[in-house]
Amino acid sequence: MVKENDYVAIFHSIHRVLKAEKILKHEEVSFLLIPVPRQLTSDCGLALRFSPDVKTELLAILADEGLPPAELFQRSGGAYLDASSQL
């Protein structure tokens, strides 16, 4: 379950999301690997869920590794808002 205001980062391949997981675990950034919520579509069935508190750090690490998410959404009011412009 995705909490209110949390972010969901989607990668369009299982390889990329698993690589992101490995990098973020090494960097000790707080996140969860989750199934992509039904309301969102993706070629990959997994996504990263993280809080607004770690958003800047997490996205910077992934960008430095050349592994930015393909899409970014934020849970707000029970819906997922497209936050890809924040990438």
What kind of region is each of these model predictions?
Residues 5-8, 12-64:
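Amphipathic, hydrophobic secondary-structure cores in small proteins
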Residues 55-87:
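C-terminal structural segments of small proteins and small subunits
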